[in-house]
Amino acid sequence: MVSALYAVLSALLLMKFSFDVVRLRMQYRVAYGDGGFSELQSAIRIHGNAVEYIPIAIVLMLFMEMNGAETWMVHICGIVLLAGRLMHYYGFHHRLFRWRRSGMSATWCALLLMVLANLWYMPWELVFSLR
C-alpha cells in the first residue's frame, strides 16, 4: 500500500516536531504552556498544526487507495502533502510568511485532491445499497 509510505514519513515528521517541542521545553525549563518564549510558541504551533492536518490527510489517502485510485494519484497527493507540511514548517520556523502560506495552500490542495478522488472512486452502488 502506497499510503503506508506517506503515513510513515508523516509520522517521522510529527516525531521531529514533537522532539523540537520537548527539546525547547527542557532548554527553557517549561513544563506547561510556552513560558512566554516565542521559539517555544512557534514549535508548539508547528507541531499542533501538523497534528491538525496530517491524520485526516492520511485517512483520506488510505480510503482513496482502498477505493481504487491510481497509484500515481496517491503519490501526487502524498508528495504535495509532505511538501506542504515542510514548507509550512520552514516558513513558521524562519518567520517567512510566504513559505508558511504556500505550505498551507499545498496542504489544502492535497486535501482537496484526496476528497475529490474519494468522491470519484467511491463505490456508490455499495454506499446506497440496502443490503
Curated annotation (Swiss-Prot):
It holds the Pfam family MAPEG. Keywords: Cell inner membrane, Cell membrane, Membrane, Transmembrane, Transmembrane helix. The keyword Cell inner membrane applies. Its main location: membrane. InterPro entries: MAPEG-like_dom_sf, Membr-assoc_MAPEG. Residues 1-107 are cytoplasmic. Signal peptide: none annotated. It comes from the Bacteria. Residues 129-131 are periplasmic. The keyword Transmembrane helix applies. One of its GO terms (cellular component) is plasma membrane. The chain crosses the membrane at residues 108-128. It is a single-pass membrane protein. This is Inner membrane protein YecN. It comes from Escherichia coli (strain K12). The lineage of its organism: Bacteria, Pseudomonadati, Pseudomonadota, Gammaproteobacteria, Enterobacterales.
